Amino acid sequence: WRRDCAFHHSISHTGPITVGVLSEGAIGIDVEFENRRIGVSPSLLLRRMFSTEQDAAACLERWSLLQLWTIKEAVLKASGYGLAGGLTNVALNRQRGSAECFGQVYGLTLLRWHQYLITIAAKQNV
């Protein structure tokens, strides 16, 4: 153990699984069961996740609602704000597979393990 070692970490869990990631730079991870029941209407959740209906519709062409949730939560964790940073503050670049939050760009890695959706967001040095 070294106090001058600047590692960043993030963990997430759902049901029986826990995932974690360690990096030398800012990083976030989120996991969700792909068939998870959502306790609110999808339209309400989309309004809380996106500034405009057009942004929501464009992102739903590429990703499922739960994938979008894992992306936004992983980015907010990597930013250091967590969900308090606000889901609408995460802008997705569908062509590049990246996201922007509070002026920082985050690379995205989307994984599927069994029936779980996992997203890792890593801050990019631009």
Residue spans for each PLM region:
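Core catalytic alpha/beta fold that binds nucleotide/phospho-ligands
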Residues: 1-126
